[in-house]
């Protein structure tokens, strides 16, 4: 029972009554409680972690931009210089929330990515849900990689189009589905870096296949921005396919270290999304500060070649060390900042993650049902600020905990 002294902050009898009401609120329906119990029994119950000072091998902050004092200060200076001192957007962008910094940021993003237009969304989730629920129409077909992110799947579920998943990065399976559906508007959906495996598709051949069947290619670049390409522009530009890919989803909470997302495409696509993407229309926009941070992070990305190279060096060092320590068979093949070691079983992978954390390394276990049963894993996220010594040490510990030597 909660002790009385914990309610001392309530000053009035009305407040006390409200506190007691909250205290006595109805429990969850039994069906929901049972679902939580099943998760607990399966060692799969998700819980919010506490902040730690462990060595970071868990976050998506690949370039360390989230803690960049330069980005922080430059954002503040931009807002002051442009008289953008509001704390919030005040409304949706179609009403009162379309502040001038939005146009500046979208123009810069489009230019950086060599796209005709960019439209900012509040998050990568909102961007994917908005796109896939609005663009593919009844009678259209969506073909999506079986490992596509949950936000893509949720958007597809809201669409009136039919959808089929294809085997991961399997061009033959894509062509089989394309041949079965002639004379149909088809969208082929993939990711430039898959969030759980860290691998990439053969985008050149996929685009060739799409052009052969007049299909539209959509690429989620969430984990590629800041990581792949000469200036961190992503996979599509690195293979010079920006003019043939129909749409790109860029998210800013990873390599750019801030928040939000943008969909890149034609001016006509942007206009369509403004009119029909419900996750864009029916929500308060990002604050001017958030949008200015995006703009400043992009500016910083253009001059961040040193940290980008440091990240690439760390990825190479990680791959060298896992080979040296005979860990390669455990890992999904990846040349990105995401490196996943498959350790089947929720209990097993959680135990090894806990052991690494006790030794000072923040490595997260990815459990089923987030990944299929039998594909549970440790996911190592590499950063420009990790040292080679830290990488070697965490892999040596992994070898000890897995192999016992």
Name each model feature, range by range.
Residues 131-150:
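Conserved PLP-anchoring active-site segment centered on the Schiff-base-forming lysine
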Residues 26-87:
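N-terminal "arm"/small-domain region of PLP-dependent enzymes with the aminotransferase-like
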Residues 164, 168-219:
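Active-site phosphate-binding strand-loop segment of PLP-dependent enzymes
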Residues 65, 310-316, 325-359, 382-384:
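Conserved PLP-binding catalytic core of the aspartate aminotransferase-like
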Residues 80-123, 315:
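Conserved N-terminal alpha-helix of the aminotransferase class I/II PLP-enzyme fold
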Residues 255-322, 329-331:
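PLP-dependent aminotransferase class I/II
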Residues 23-24, 67-69, 73, 111, ...:
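PLP-dependent enzyme catalytic core of the Aspartate aminotransferase-like
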Residues 231, 237-272:
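Active-site PLP attachment segment
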């Amino acid at each position: 029972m909660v002790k009385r002294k914990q309610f001392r902050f309530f000053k009035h009898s009305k407040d006390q009554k409200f506190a007691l009401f909250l205290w006595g609120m109805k429990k969850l329906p039994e069906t929901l409680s049972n679902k939580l119990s099943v998760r607990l029994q399966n060692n799969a119950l998700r819980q919010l972690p506490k902040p730690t000072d462990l060595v970071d091998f868990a976050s998506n902050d690949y370039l360390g931009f989230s803690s960049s004092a330069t980005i922080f200060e430059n954002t503040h200076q931009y807002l002051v210089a442009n008289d953008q001192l509001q704390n919030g957007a005040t409304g949706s962008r179609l009403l009162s929330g379309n502040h001038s910094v939005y146009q500046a940021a979208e123009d810069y993003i489009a230019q950086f990515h060599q796209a005709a237009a960019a439209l900012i969304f509040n998050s990568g989730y909102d961007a994917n849900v908005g796109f896939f629920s609005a663009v593919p129409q009844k009678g259209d077909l969506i073909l999506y990689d079986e490992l596509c992110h949950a936000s893509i799947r949720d958007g597809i579920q809201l669409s009136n189009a039919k959808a089929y998943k294809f085997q991961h990065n399997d061009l033959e399976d894509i062509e089989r589905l394309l041949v079965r559906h002639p004379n149909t508007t088809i969208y082929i959906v993939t990711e430039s870096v898959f969030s759980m495996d860290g691998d990439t598709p053969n985008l050149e051949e996929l685009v060739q296949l799409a052009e052969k069947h007049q299909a539209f290619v959509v690429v989620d670049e969430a984990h590629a921005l800041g990581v792949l390409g000469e200036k961190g522009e992503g996979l599509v530009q690195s293979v010079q396919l920006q003019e043939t890919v129909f749409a790109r989803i860029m998210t800013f909470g990873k390599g750019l270290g801030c928040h939000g997302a943008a969909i890149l495409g034609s001016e006509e696509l942007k206009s369509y999304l403004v009119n029909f993407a419900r996750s864009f229309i029916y929500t308060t926009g990002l604050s001017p500060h958030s949008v200015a941070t995006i703009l400043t992070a992009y500016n910083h990305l253009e001059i961040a070649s040193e940290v980008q190279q440091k990240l690439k060096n760390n990825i190479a060092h990680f791959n060298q060390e896992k080979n040296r320590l005979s860990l390669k068979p455990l890992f999904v093949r990846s040349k990105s900042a995401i490196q996943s070691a498959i350790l089947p079983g929720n209990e097993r992978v959680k135990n090894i993650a806990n052991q690494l954390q006790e030794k000072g390394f923040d490595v997260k276990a990815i459990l089923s049902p987030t990944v299929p049963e039998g594909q549970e894993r440790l996911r190592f996220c590499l950063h420009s600020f990790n040292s080679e010594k830290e990488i070697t040490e965490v892999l040596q510990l992994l070898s000890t905990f897995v192999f016992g030597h």
